[in-house]
């Protein structure tokens, strides 16, 4: 699949290191949690979750994202997708808990809106380093209860999302969706396993992608052969039992590295 050339229509600075890029194309058939391959000309092609059907939200962490931060309204980049398996939408009347850490709030925000539109009750645990880093807080607040945690205590609970989670009756929720740094997700995974509600949970994983369509195998996890780009990026908690979640990732050569 050749990249679709899109033009930037608006750039919103969410924080000093996070920006949302709106573009002149809508992926009307996207499933919340799916990703696109973003082609930054002359640099690289990298996977990113969609924060709306016409936007990506980018954290400046490397060469490709740094180059994106140099772009202005009217500039263009390439997109392939959407790819992969998204989050499972709830049924009317179900109670959903979202657990987002940092920029992991980006793919969870359209899921929250879709879940609410489907008639579900949506609650969110939103974690970040400080109050100014709580991404899309207003979008989640518009849909239901929100619980914040910050590393520095500038808003909500001082600590991590797990500190908030420990105080909730997780058994009362029908579905739990998690996205954020893998160390955070691994901590949430262990807590949900202890509470015996892992079968209700889905986790969005990030791995090094090359093709994005399940051919090259660069993003396979463990010995299971599960491909993050094709079988995921969203996996059920049961699928991840005994996996390398929170322990290992892989570099561009496919070598397993400690997280």
Curated annotation (Swiss-Prot):
Cited function: Responsible for channeling the electrons from the oxidation of dihydroorotate from the FMN redox center in the PyrD type B subunit to the ultimate electron acceptor NAD(+).
Family: Belongs to the PyrK family.
HAMAP family: DHODB_Fe_S_bind
Cofactor(s) recorded in Swiss-Prot or TrEMBL: [2Fe-2S] cluster; FAD
Lineage of the organism: Archaea, Methanobacteriati, Methanobacteriota, Stenosarchaea group, Methanomicrobia
Pathway: Pyrimidine metabolism; UMP biosynthesis via de novo pathway; orotate from (S)-dihydroorotate (NAD(+) route): step 1/1
NCBIfam families assigned: PRK00054.1-1 (NF000796)
Organism in which the protein naturally occurs: Methanosarcina acetivorans (strain ATCC 35395 / DSM 2834 / JCM 12185 / C2A)
UniProt cross-references to CDD domains, sorted A to Z: DHOD_e_trans_like2
GO biological process, one term: 'de novo' UMP biosynthetic process
Keywords: 2Fe-2S, Electron transport, FAD, Flavoprotein, Iron, Iron-sulfur, Metal-binding, Pyrimidine biosynthesis, Transport
Subunit composition and interactions: Heterotetramer of 2 PyrK and 2 PyrD type B subunits.
GO MF term (any one): electron transfer activity
Protein name: Probable dihydroorotate dehydrogenase B (NAD(+)), electron transfer subunit
Residues involved in [2Fe-2S] cluster binding: 211, 216, 219, 229
InterPro entries, sorted: Cyt_c3_hydrogenase_gsu, Dihydroorotate_DH_ele_sf, Dihydroorotate_DH_Fe-S-bd, Dihydroorotate_DHASE_ETsu, FAD-bd_FR_type, FNR_nucleotide-bd, OxRdtase_FAD/NAD-bd, PyrK_electron_transfer
Cofactor binding description: Binds 1 [2Fe-2S] cluster per subunit. Binds 1 FAD per subunit.
Positions of the FAD-binding FR-type domain: 1-89
């Amino acid at each position: 699949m050749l990249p679709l050339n899109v033009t930037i229509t608006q750039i919103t600075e969410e924080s000093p290191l996070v920006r949302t890029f709106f573009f002149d194309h809508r992926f009307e058939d996207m499933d919340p949690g799916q990703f696109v391959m973003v082609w930054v000309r002359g640099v690289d092609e990298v996977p990113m979750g969609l924060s709306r059907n016409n936007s990506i939200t980018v954290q400046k962490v490397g060469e490709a994202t740094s180059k994106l931060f140099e772009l202005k309204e009217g500039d263009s980049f390439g997109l392939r997708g959407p790819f992969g398996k998204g989050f499972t939408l709830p049924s009317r009347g179900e109670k959903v808990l979202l657990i987002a850490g940092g920029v992991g709030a980006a793919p969870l925000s359209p899921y929250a809106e879709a879940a609410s539109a489907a008639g579900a009750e949506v609650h969110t645990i939103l974690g970040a380093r400080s109050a100014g880093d709580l991404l899309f807080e207003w979008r989640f607040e518009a849909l239901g209860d929100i619980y914040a945690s910050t590393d520095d205590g500038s808003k909500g609970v001082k600590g991590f999302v797990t500190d908030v989670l420990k105080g909730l009756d997780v058994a009362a929720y029908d579905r739990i969706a998690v996205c954020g740094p893998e160390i955070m997700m691994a901590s949430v995974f262990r807590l949900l396993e202890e509470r015996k509600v892992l079968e209700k949970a889905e986790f969005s994983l990030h791995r090094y992608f090359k093709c994005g369509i399940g051919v090259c195998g660069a993003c396979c996890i463990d010995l299971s052969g599960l491909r993050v780009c094709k079988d995921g990026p969203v996996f059920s908690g049961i699928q991840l039992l005994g996996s390398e979640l929170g322990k290992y990732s892989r570099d561009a050569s496919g070598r397993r590295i400690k997280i």
